[in-house]
């Protein structure tokens, strides 16, 4: 019986706390015409009837499965959205009336807990509000503020946002026209504007957030992530191994490509020292070869070790000979290249001192440039061509006449085939020896070329003529034939002339 009486008392309190009907005037409007005590009694009676009807309609809907959203089908009216705050005197009278009622504040808190448990449970059915125009009830604070306050009491259900506050005179339910509704208590007043649909979400720490706030926070978080990635800073995902923005440092390795050698070094001087000490100095026997893979002189024997040492510098890329002039970072693979480079600094200094003269072109240290300068120097030494040519027709006739006379005397062209001189003999003397033989003294024409000779009388017929090659003539007497036979010429050209004109 005690439990039944307690339930009846809870139902009475629940009916008294239920919202007003749409047609009933607000408590602020009635307060001007009726005394506060009569107003409270009428409100209690109407609330009891509406609460009983709501419990009969909803039944066990409040105890359904948790996790859903309680939706109200009624749209809030502008009249009910405005909350009428009473004066401080009316609040005190309400508190006295509530204190004198059966059950007191404890029964009110139990009734509010029942409301929170019945409305906070998650159900798939839609809950129809009996008072579609009522969106909020009057609060006991008396400050008349509108809006939502953070819940100060524990939440009503596991999935519902309804909460009950001890000592509060009413609990309000905010209907948002099909969106999620959150009822807040704890002495605070709540109201929603006419056409606005506000949805709330739960933050990470359990506090409700509006949808607009949550979207802004998500977009700002994404922008922070993008800026972090673009700036190259490490994020927690990168620290966990999901990403990496650190660039690997570039490292150049110098590999030895000598046959059957796989050594690797960090710099070209180290590679050059390795080649010189292991592969070059290690060769014995007087024969030196390059066994570098892909070399154009691969395995070509050489007798010069210094050549192999200079050649290996092309493979190692080392340039040990650096310029001694301050401020110059040039380096060379050979000492000769360094020797040709150093004078260019001083030639530039000398040319800069002479400002009036144009800047001289820098001499190239290459062999091609040196050969070109040598050729130009030799060309200047040669005599300039004569402006007048004295080889005219008269000179040509004189040369032709001398050639004809020479041919008549020597018969080079007619009988000697162009390379031999034909001599004719005449008897200038005759003698008889003791043995009885007769000898003749022959004189050769042209004169003064061949000496006179004594021959037997029987040989006279054979020695009427004698053919002698120009190369076999005595040089001291051959010039008597013609000065041009043995003219002065370079030794190389003379030998070539003899080979071409006097083949043996």
Curated annotation (Swiss-Prot):
PTM-bearing positions, type N-acetylalanine: 2
Regions of compositional bias (Acidic residues) in chain numbering: 36-49, 86-110
Organs and tissues of expression: Expressed in brain, brown adipose tissue, white adipose tissue, heart, kidney, lung, skeletal muscle, small intestine and spleen. Expressed at low levels in liver.
PTM sites of type Phosphoserine: 18, 21, 24, 131, 199, 203-204, 383
Compositionally biased tracts (Polar residues): 345-358
Protein name: Zinc finger protein AEBP2
Residue ranges with Low complexity bias: 16-30, 129-140
KW Transcription (keyword) present: yes
Annotated stretches, region: Disordered: 1-219, 345-387
Gene designation: Aebp2
SUPFAM superfamilies listed in its UniProt record: beta-beta-alpha zinc fingers (SSF57667)
Any one Gene Ontology BP term: regulation of DNA-templated transcription
Region of interest (Interaction with RBBP4), ranges: 202-287
Alphabetical UniProt keywords: Acetylation, Chromatin regulator, DNA-binding, Metal-binding, Nucleus, Phosphoprotein, Repeat, Repressor, Transcription, Transcription regulation, Zinc, Zinc-finger
The protein's role, per its UniProt record: Acts as an accessory subunit for the core Polycomb repressive complex 2 (PRC2), which mediates histone H3K27 (H3K27me3) trimethylation on chromatin leading to transcriptional repression of the affected target gene. Plays a role in nucleosome localization of the PRC2 complex.
Record's subunit section: Self-associates. Associates with the PRC2 complex, which consists of the core components EED, EZH1 or EZH2, SUZ12, and RBBP4, and various combinations of accessory subunits including AEBP2, JARID2, PHF19, MTF2 and EPOP. Found in a monomeric PRC2.2 (class 2) complex consisting of at least SUZ12, RBBP4, AEBP2 and JARID2. Within the PRC2 complex, interacts directly with SUZ12; competes with PHF19 for SUZ12 binding. Interacts with EED, EZH2, and RBBP4. May also interact with RBBP7.
Composition skew (Gly residues), residue ranges: 59-69, 154-168, 178-189
Subcellular location: Nucleus
Chain positions covered by the region annotation Important for nucleosome binding activity of the PRC2 complex: 488-504
């Amino acid at each position: 019986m005690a439990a039944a009486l307690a339930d009846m008392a809870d139902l009475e309190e629940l009916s008294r706390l239920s919202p007003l009907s749409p047609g009933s005037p607000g408590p602020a409007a009635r307060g001007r015409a009726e005394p506060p005590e009569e107003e409270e009694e009428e409100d209690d009676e109407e609330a009891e009837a509406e609460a009983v009807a709501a419990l009969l309609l909803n039944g066990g809907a409040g105890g359904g499965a948790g996790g859903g959203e309680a939706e109200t089908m009624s749209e809030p009216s502008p009249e009910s959205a405005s909350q009428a705050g009473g004066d401080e005197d009316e609040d005190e009278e309400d508190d006295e009336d509530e204190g004198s009622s059966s059950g007191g504040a404890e029964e009110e808190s139990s009734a509010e807990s029942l409301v929170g448990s019945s409305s906070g449970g998650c159900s798939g059915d839609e809950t129809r509000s009996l008072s579609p125009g009522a969106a909020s009830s009057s609060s006991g604070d008396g400050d008349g503020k509108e809006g939502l306050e953070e819940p100060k009491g524990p939440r009503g259900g596991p999935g519902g946002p309804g909460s009950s506050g001890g000592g509060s005179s009413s609990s309000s339910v905010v209907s948002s026209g099909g969106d999620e509704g959150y009822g807040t208590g704890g002495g605070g007043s709540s109201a929603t504007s006419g056409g606005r649909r506000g949805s709330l979400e739960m933050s990470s720490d359990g506090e409700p957030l509006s949808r607009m706030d949550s979207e802004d926070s998500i977009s700002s978080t994404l922008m922070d992530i993008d800026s972090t990635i673009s700036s190259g800073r490490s994020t927690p995902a990168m620290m966990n191994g999901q990403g990496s923005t650190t660039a690997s440092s570039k490292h150049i390795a110098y590999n030895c490509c000598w046959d059957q050698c796989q050594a690797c070094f960090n710099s070209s001087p180290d590679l050059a020292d390795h080649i010189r000490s292991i592969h070059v100095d290690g060769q014995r026997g007087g024969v030196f070869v390059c066994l570098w893979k892909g070399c154009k002189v691969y395995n070509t024997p050489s007798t010069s070790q210094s050549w192999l040492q200079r050649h290996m510098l092309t493979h190692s890329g080392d340039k040990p000979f650096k310029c001694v002039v301050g401020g110059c970072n040039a380096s060379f693979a050979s000492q000769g290249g360094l020797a040709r480079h150093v004078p260019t600094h001083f030639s530039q200094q000398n040319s800069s001192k002479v400002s009036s003269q144009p800047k001289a072109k820098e001499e190239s240290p290459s062999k091609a440039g040196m050969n070109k300068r040598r050729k130009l120097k030799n060309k200047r030494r040669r005599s300039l061509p004569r402006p007048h040519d004295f080889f005219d027709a008269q000179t040509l006739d004189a040369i032709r006449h001398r050639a004809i006379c020479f041919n008549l005397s020597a018969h080079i062209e007619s009988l000697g085939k162009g390379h031999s001189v034909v001599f004719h003999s005449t008897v200038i003397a005759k003698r008889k020896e003791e043995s009885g033989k007769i000898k003749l003294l022959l004189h050769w024409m042209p004169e003064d070329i061949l000496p006179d000779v004594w021959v037997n009388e029987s040989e006279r017929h054979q020695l009427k003529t004698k053919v002698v090659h120009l190369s076999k003539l005595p040089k001291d007497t051959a010039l008597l034939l013609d000065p041009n036979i043995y003219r002065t010429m370079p030794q190389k050209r003379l030998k070539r002339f003899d080979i071409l004109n006097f083949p043996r």
